């Protein structure tokens, strides 16, 4: 029998997910920023073609030289602020949607319904959360892509400045640039992220007493696979985010479809996966989120 939702349980999920997300995101912030720069540099007004980063190592070497060591954490505060409600809402809604998708389903006799139910609950949770926090995700991307060294060279002076300038130049819609492809990508990512993880754990002899190392190993595989599958969607959405604040003559992509086509034609299919290896490394943080979530939830009783 599926338990009924209760306010305390929802709040506990929210808190456990948020705490684990904030800790893991701060730990992998340098990798996150390198990945972001490799993804969007071709669409950046600040990075000339001959100054583009050649790869992950080049990016790691040049960032502290050109922007200072603290630049590795540029946009991290915005990322934590964004990630806390995003991840917390994902986990909290995941359990709510589970009741809708998995009510009365026996995992032992109805495996495929159980698997598809987990996919559905994970995807729905991610899409729902995205509606609430997308402007923060947009701001985090633009702050992370800002390569100016001092205040005078920076495009934005912080989270609020980024939001204000974007709304002033593009209106509220400017904060939701790339939203459609983001929803597509988040559903694919979250479906794999939650669906496969919960299904794999559910198939273990004693899921509630699973070793933390086994949980981490399962989570590592899940986050890596789901991250690679959804990576092209992430690249396109971030490229679209880079269009806000530009004059019409400077806009590179007319819409999402145009972005897909131009990246493929002008840069090749490999461009959709720029920074993907750093995303695999970053996936360690995602795996830690899943494991920490279970541990924190257990501590909260």
Curated annotation (Swiss-Prot):
Q: Name one GO molecular function term.
A: ATP:ADP antiporter activity
Motif Nucleotide carrier signature motif is found at 237-242
Region named Important for transport activity: 237-242
Q: How does it sit in the membrane?
A: Multi-pass membrane protein
**Superkingdom as given in the UniProt entry:** Eukaryota
Q: Which reaction does it catalyse?
A: ADP(in) + ATP(out) = ADP(out) + ATP(in)
Q: How is its activity regulated?
A: The matrix-open state (m-state) is inhibited by the membrane-permeable bongkrekic acid (BKA). The cytoplasmic-open state (c-state) is inhibited by the membrane-impermeable toxic inhibitor carboxyatractyloside (CATR).
Localization, per the record, is: Mitochondrion inner membrane
User: Do you know which InterPro entries this protein is assigned to?
Assistant: ADT_euk_type, Mit_carrier, Mitochondrial_sb/sol_carrier, Mt_carrier_dom_sf
Q: Which Pfam families match?
A: Mito_carr (PF00153)
| Solcar repeats by residue range | 8-100, 113-203, 210-299
**Residues engaged in binding ADP:** 82, 94, 237
Listed A to Z, the keywords are: Antiport, Membrane, Mitochondrion, Mitochondrion inner membrane, Repeat, Transmembrane, Transmembrane helix, Transport
> Which terms does the UniProt entry file under GO BP?
mitochondrial ADP transmembrane transport; mitochondrial ATP transmembrane transport; negative regulation of mitochondrial outer membrane permeabilization involved in apoptotic signaling pathway
Question: Which parts of the chain span the membrane according to its record?
Answer: 10-39, 77-101, 112-132, 181-201, 213-233, 276-293
Provide the function of this protein: ADP:ATP antiporter that mediates import of ADP into the mitochondrial matrix for ATP synthesis, and export of ATP out to fuel the cell. Cycles between the cytoplasmic-open state (c-state) and the matrix-open state (m-state): operates by the alternating access mechanism with a single substrate-binding site intermittently exposed to either the cytosolic (c-state) or matrix (m-state) side of the inner mitochondrial membrane.
Subunit field text:
Monomer.
The domain section of the record reads: The transmembrane helices are not perpendicular to the plane of the membrane, but cross the membrane at an angle. Odd-numbered transmembrane helices exhibit a sharp kink, due to the presence of a conserved proline residue.
Q: What is the similarity comment for this entry?
A: Belongs to the mitochondrial carrier (TC 2.A.29) family.
- Entry protein name: ADP,ATP carrier protein 1
